[in-house]
Amino acid sequence: MKSALFSRFFILLPWILIVIIMLDVDTRRPAPPLTPRPYFSPYAVGRGGARLPPRRGGPDSGPGRGWEKRNESRPHARPRPEPPLPTIYAITPTYSRPVQKAELTRLANTFRQVAQLHWILVEDAAARSELVSRFLARAGLPSTHLHVPTPRRYKRPGLPRATEQRNAGLAWLRQRHQHQRAQPGVLFFADDDNTYSLELFQEMRTTRKVSVWPVGLVGGRRYERPLVENGKVVGWYTGWRADRPFAIDMAGFAVSLQVILSNPKAVFKRRGSQPGMQESDFLKQITTVEELEPKANNCTKVLVWHTRTEKVNLANEPKYRLDTVKIEV
């Protein structure tokens, strides 16, 4: 009996071993990744956990589709074009002297950093000088070169200076805009011996009619300025004749171009004008004190200085035996 069992066992043993080996090999093979089947709920969760019903109708709806937000593109409105930047017209009287080119160079270096500025340079001469012509050609600035001589009788000490030159600049502006619609612009008188902060040009560009601000190193004081209360000019802090209608320096105001064009007879006067009264005589023709627009933080910041170049000492300049090279200074 036992021998029969052992014989059957040994007959089945190889087959059992083969089955075990096959099962072991099959279990060692990497199982394919399980791909979860998508589940579409008939309800979608909205903000705050609220359950939203499915969308019905429309090309994107269908059985098994949940609610989804469509990001439909809408045409954007075109931005409005920015208004043109007002042009600043700077009228600069100048005359021949040893420091002329140095003064103009300093001024040009400032103007070159100001956007939309047109320089009107007016020589006190019967003709344009080669020095100024060459200088403007290399200055890299939009400019106009004018000339008009001061009559000999008005060159005496104590009389107003640069009257004819400023009037020539005003006449050029009016003639240029006579037959065309004037673009926004601002005019100011920039003497070639002044020093300007770039912030001043930002302030004056928003001038509606006539704007004013302090001036440093003028009138025998560290500064002069309009006195302002509640945004209005009520007086003048000045070291000379505070009774003037406009006790202000030529470097202390700017005028809208439209005001200049609307007052074609407004000029600087020779007859009847007293020394130091040119600013008042001019401004009386175009505005009143009540209409003045204070700039520079209600006229509490100095952004322009009435600097003066020291008189040059040329005592050692030779009259004979000159340099063999002619150099422009």
From Swiss-Prot:
Record's GO cellular component terms: Golgi membrane
Glycosylation site positions: 71, 298
Subcellular location: Golgi apparatus membrane
Topology class, membrane: Single-pass type II membrane protein
Residue intervals annotated with topology Lumenal: 24-329
UniProt entry tagged with the keyword Glycoprotein: yes
Substrates-to-products reaction catalysed: 3-O-(beta-D-galactosyl-(1->3)-beta-D-galactosyl-(1->4)-beta-D-xylosyl)-L-seryl-[protein] + UDP-alpha-D-glucuronate = 3-O-(beta-D-GlcA-(1->3)-beta-D-Gal-(1->3)-beta-D-Gal-(1->4)-beta-D-Xyl)-L-seryl-[protein] + UDP + H(+)
Keywords: Glycoprotein, Golgi apparatus, Manganese, Membrane, Metal-binding, Signal-anchor, Transferase, Transmembrane, Transmembrane helix
Function according to Swiss-Prot or TrEMBL: Involved in the biosynthesis of L2/HNK-1 carbohydrate epitope on both glycolipids and glycoproteins.
Family: Belongs to the glycosyltransferase 43 family.
Protein name: Galactosylgalactosylxylosylprotein 3-beta-glucuronosyltransferase 2
Native source organism of the sequence: Canis lupus familiaris
Gene: B3GAT2
